[in-house]
Amino acid sequence: QILCSVKGGVTMKIDLTEKQFRRLLDLVYVGNWVMNSTRGDDRIREYDDVESTVFANCLSHGMVPLVEAYQGELIPSRAFAEGGIHEAIMAYEDTMFFEILAQELALRDMDSDAPTPENVDELRERMDTYLGEFEQHGTDNITVEM
């Protein structure tokens, strides 16, 4: 059971198994990473606050190594951050990079700006060709002429 205090003094209780709570930590961390990792000093504090609130529950659930204090707040520990979560983020980013690149190149080849119901089959076929190339060779065969 995790407890989350909501503004106005209301406390929310969520019943989770230990395994579910551990997965929730991953989800919260990844969500905050997506929302804030590229923002520099312009972070969305509300997401940091949610992350801190959820990770604070590590203290009462035998997961102390996953949280640490920083500037008066509880944040995911270095042990948590180095425990494989960034490998999952990187795998997702790599997949998205190649999917987006394949779509952009396929649309370029088709002289189209966006997928439409009329071109979706051709687009998918061209994307699959590019994705096969990327799977075999990564970016080794990509050239840019300037």
Task: List each language-model region with its residue ranges.
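Glycine-rich, aromatic-bearing surface loops/beta-hairpins
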Residues: 108-146
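Compositionally biased amphipathic helical and low-complexity segments enriched in hydrophobic
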Residues: 4, 26, 106-108
